[in-house]
A protein has these predicted regions:
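Alpha/propeptide regions of enzymes that mature by internal proteolysis
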Residues: 3-62, 67, 71-73, 80-116
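Single conserved hydrophobic/aromatic residue that forms the stacking wall/gate
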Residues: 120-129
């Protein structure tokens, strides 16, 4: 039986969002590098080199790849045998708390693009104060 603690879920969501904010997927970096190696046009090579340099700087400095960090979409699947521990929040509230913490991380604050949810009446998990 899997046991999931509330704080672990919140931290996992926050950590995952921070991670994807500053790391390009390896297949993307490999594809840009391969295209750079094949490219004959100097301006195109320069543009791809800058993309690769920027990608590395983001990864090393833990800074977002793009200023607009987008909209968070979480797909959350829980098995029947999961046992929750230390839970005082609903799964949705735990995920929203993880998103909030990721966006307000003191070392890498992310820019919130959405002020309120477009589909429902619930507010964005981002603090406004």
């Amino acid at each position: 039986m899997a046991r999931i603690h509330q704080d672990h879920l919140i931290d996992s969501v926050a950590d995952a969002l921070q991670f994807i904010s500053y790391y390009h997927p390896k297949d993307f970096v490999d594809a840009v590098h391969a295209a750079y190696e094949r490219e004959e046009s100097k301006p195109a090579k320069d543009a791809m080199a800058q993309i690769l340099i920027n990608s590395r700087l983001c990864a090393e400095g833990h800074r977002p790849i793009c200023q607009d960090t987008g909209i968070v979409t979480v797909f959350f699947k829980v098995g029947m045998d999961v046992q929750w521990e230390g839970v005082t929040m609903s799964p949705t509230d735990m995920i929203n708390e993880g998103v909030r913490r990721a966006y307000l991380h003191p070392d890498n604050k992310l820019r919130a693009s959405i002020l309120a949810c477009l589909l429902y009446t619930s507010p964005s998990p981002r603090d406004r104060g």
